[in-house]
């Protein structure tokens, strides 16, 4: 099986919008042709898309930056630029996406194959000069730049989705059990912590398929993070049945029943809901002579603790002994459950992050560390990012909007005077004569 990676940090950049054009009709029989500059195309957006064929975030170890196509610039004769193509990034089911949106960290859980999450919106195309013609200005020499596409950092975290989670102390035989009931081939060796990340396998019994996750070995203190406990325990959260694998022969020199109590205490400390999940007990390594004595001693204790006698199975994962009754019981329990992980419904749902309902005309001022005032606000930031400062009419338009919105008055009231710098978006402007030019 390929390396299992369950955390990744990536950056995504949507495409910038294409620039609008400031051109005029130049035709023989049209003496007053007027403006004919087209609009720029919208930039492509970036989506995460759930793929049922992935079960790890390994691809993001090698590629961490993703961009969508830019919108094309406009043409003459009102020709609109082509829209940039969207980018789709495939992620496995069970991926949790976290991002900072408007100063708040938001998380979205992607579970269903086909489900999409819009993570970066493409920029709008800039308007051509046809939009700026007025009765008093019939030859506008002004066009907008394309709006920059959104860019953000995403934290990806995978919690495996499986029907059955194999839990137990290191070296209890979980990986061997997984390899015997499925086609998975996890690393197996006779020392603790051979498994450092979950292994997944698809098992089939009596024409019923189910997904099994071999969870790395837990130890005392796992619920507090000891021995990578938090990294391991979170992968159990989305399993529906727990199979507790015990070294019934005590080959590691520990008391198997004490191991049983310790693991269950850690499960309860991590999540009370997790501790209530259906649990089967597999008394493993029964092919070793000492196991029979431990079995006779442990079975009454495990039953007294609360495990149904029907849910206790002596097995030998190494020799395939006793595995069929265990699998039969797993299938019986899963058949009674309303949902099967292996049959997650396909979804065409497109999810988005939550954005505030702040009035786009609102703005506020912030003094930065060097004492320069910065203007924040959706509309004003978008306008500045789409202003072509090489066009005098664009500067005049910006000045009119600043004054109409009350930004100029607010800056003057805040103490800005002639020649002082003011920052809006990525631009640094100079205050001139009680206005910004």
UniProtKB/Swiss-Prot annotation:
Q: What class of enzyme is it?
A: hydrolase
Where in or outside the cell it occurs: the entry states: Cytoplasm
Grouped into one coarse class, the protein's main location is: cytoplasm
A GO MF annotation of the entry reads:
magnesium ion binding
Required cofactor(s): Mg(2+)
The EC code for this enzyme is 3.6.5.-
PROSITE patterns noted in UniProt = G_OBG (PS51710), GTP1_OBG (PS00905), OBG (PS51883), OCT (PS51881)
Top-level taxon of origin = Bacteria
**What does UniProt give as GO cellular component?**
cytoplasm
This protein's UniProt keywords: Cytoplasm, GTP-binding, Hydrolase, Magnesium, Metal-binding, Nucleotide-binding
**Binding residues annotated for Mg(2+), in chain numbering:** 175, 195
Q: Look up the record and give one Gene Ontology term from the biological process aspect.
A: ribosome biogenesis
The UniProt entry, under InterPro entries, shows: G_OBG, GTP-bd, GTP-bd_Obg/CgtA, GTP-bd_prot_GTP1/OBG_C_sf, GTP1-OBG_CS, GTP1_OBG_dom, GTP1_OBG_dom_sf, OBG_GTPase
Q: Which residues participate in GTP binding?
A: 168-175, 193-197, 214-217, 284-287, 316-318
The answer to whether UniProt assigns keyword Metal-binding to this entry is yes
Residue stretches making up the OBG-type G domain: 162-335
Query: Where would I find the OCT domain in this sequence?
Result: 355-433
Q: Which residues form the Obg domain?
A: 2-161
- The yes or no answer to whether the keyword Nucleus is present is no
- What family does this chain come from, according to its entry? Belongs to the TRAFAC class OBG-HflX-like GTPase superfamily. OBG GTPase family.
Q: What does this protein do?
A: An essential GTPase which binds GTP, GDP and possibly (p)ppGpp with moderate affinity, with high nucleotide exchange rates and a fairly low GTP hydrolysis rate. Plays a role in control of the cell cycle, stress response, ribosome biogenesis and in those bacteria that undergo differentiation, in morphogenesis control.
The subunit field of the Swiss-Prot or TrEMBL record says:
Monomer.
Query: By what name is this protein known?
Result: GTPase Obg
Species the sequence originates in: Herpetosiphon aurantiacus (strain ATCC 23779 / DSM 785 / 114-95)
């Amino acid at each position: 099986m390929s390396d299992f990676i369950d955390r990744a940090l990536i950056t995504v950049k949507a495409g910038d919008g294409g620039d609008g054009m400031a051109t005029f009709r130049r035709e023989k029989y049209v003496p007053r042709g007027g403006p004919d500059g087209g609009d720029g195309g919208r930039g492509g957006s970036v989506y995460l898309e759930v793929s049922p064929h992935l079960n790890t975030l390994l691809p993001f170890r090698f590629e961490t930056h993703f961009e969508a196509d830019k919108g094309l610039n406009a043409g003459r004769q009102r020709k609109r630029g082509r829209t940039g193509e969207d980018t789709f990034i495939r992620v496995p089911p069970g991926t949790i996406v976290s991002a900072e949106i408007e100063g708040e960290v938001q998380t979205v859980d992607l579970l269903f194959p086909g489900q999409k999450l819009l993570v970066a919106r493409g920029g709008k195309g800039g308007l051509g000069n046809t939009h700026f013609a007025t009765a008093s200005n019939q030859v506008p020499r002004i066009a907008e730049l394309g709006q920059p596409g959104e860019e953000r950092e995403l934290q990806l975290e995978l919690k495996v989705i499986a029907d059955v989670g194999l839990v137990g102390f290191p070296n209890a035989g979980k990986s061997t059990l997984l390899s015997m009931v499925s086609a998975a081939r996890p690393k197996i060796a006779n020392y603790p912590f051979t498994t450092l990340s979950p292994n997944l396998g698809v098992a089939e019994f009596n024409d019923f398929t189910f997904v099994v996750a071999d969870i790395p070995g837990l130890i005392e203190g796992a619920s507090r993070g000891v021995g990578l406990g938090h990294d391991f325990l979170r992968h159990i959260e989305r399993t529906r049945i727990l199979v507790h694998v015990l070294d019934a022969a005590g080959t590691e020199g520990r008391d198997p029943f004490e191991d049983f109590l310790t693991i269950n205490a850690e499960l309860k400390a991590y999540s009370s809901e997790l501790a209530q999940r259906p649990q089967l007990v597999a008394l493993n390594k029964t092919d070793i002579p000492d196991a029979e004595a431990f079995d006779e001693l442990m079975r009454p204790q495990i039953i007294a603790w609360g495990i149904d006698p029907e849910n206790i199975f002596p097995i030998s994962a190494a020799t395939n002994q006793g595995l069929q009754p265990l699998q039969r019981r797993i299938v019986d329990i899963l058949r009674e459950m309303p949902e099967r992980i292996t049959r997650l419904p396909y979804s065409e749902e497109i999810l988005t992050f939550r954005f505030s309902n702040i009035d786009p005309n609102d703005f506020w001022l912030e003094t930065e560390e060097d004492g320069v005032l910065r203007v924040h606000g959706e509309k004003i930031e978008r306008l500045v990012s789409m202003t072509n400062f090489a066009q005098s009419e664009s500067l005049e338009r910006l000045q009119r909007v600043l004054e109409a919105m009350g930004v100029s008055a607010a800056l003057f009231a805040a103490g800005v005077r002639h020649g002082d710098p003011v920052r809006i978006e990525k631009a640094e402007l100079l205050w001139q004569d009680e206005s910004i030019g």
